Amino acid sequence: MHMKMNFIKLLPVLLLGACSTYQPQEAVEQPQQQAEIAPPAPARQAAVAAVAAVSKDNCGVGCPVGGSSQTLIRDAYTLNNNASTKFANWVAYKMTSSSQASGRSRTWRQDPDLPASDTLAPAAYTGANAALAVDRGHQAPLAGLGGSSDWQSLNYLSNITPQRADLNQGAWVRLEDKERALSNSKTVYTVTGPLFERNIATLPNAAGVQIPSGYWKILFTGSSPADGKFAAFIMDQDTPRAANFCNFQVTVSQIEQKTGLTIWSSLPANVANTIKSQKGALASDLGC
């Protein structure tokens, strides 16, 4: 499903446009810190003026097609927001040895570059951990991308979802650990996002906001997945903490069917159709 390209200059980020269309324990819930106040619009505009408005390619072989018109392109990641769910449809990022940084703080903020009605504020998570046993889970990971120039945007709630603690601190973080280790020697392109296949619960302090039923992640190394070095995973929100992420490998086609997205949108159709129906060979590099 292709949509008309429509790029609009953002405030503290590079672009907002229509797109043809979570490390070690860093992902673990931390005590909530006081939300910062976004700088006023003129200050953000001045920041933009000081930086060349160049789009970073965080997708490698085309960003997913079939999401919304709210696409944010940042140094750390590219994100497509869903104003209905209040979470991203997908988040894509490029991880390398130089993109990593440890010890980055978690200061949760509402995304200043989305309409306030289309994303969550920190108060939305009040009481969620106690009531639902969920953490604030990064989609683009903080440790793996903390070396980015705009790493603070990793803590914007547009990049966060309420993820069960057993998943966030279990199979999901172990996959992130392997992803980060792999990026020490190779460029890793990843796209990830939530699933809403059944009703589980709503955030207690955000009426009507459903928590995702699961998550998906697709990774490839090098310049293209066409050489077979890719892997895709789907993990249910209720995945036990001790589960092995290797047991949740799927095909890219399965993820496309569940999400309605077209992944790797710039790949030639004949190549895409072939590899998307396969599980790929990257899982062995991830310890599977």
Predicted regions mapped to residue ranges:
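Short Pro/Gly-enriched beta-strand edge/turn motifs at strand-loop
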Residues: 9, 59-64, 197-204
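C-terminal motif of bacterial Sec signal peptides marking the signal peptidase cleavage site
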Residues: 17-18
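N-terminal module-boundary/linker segments of secreted carbohydrate-active enzymes
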Residues: 21-89, 95-96, 269-288
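Short, His- and charge-rich active-site/binding loops that engage polyanionic ligands
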Residues: 71-136
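Sec-dependent signal peptide recognition
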Residues: 4-13
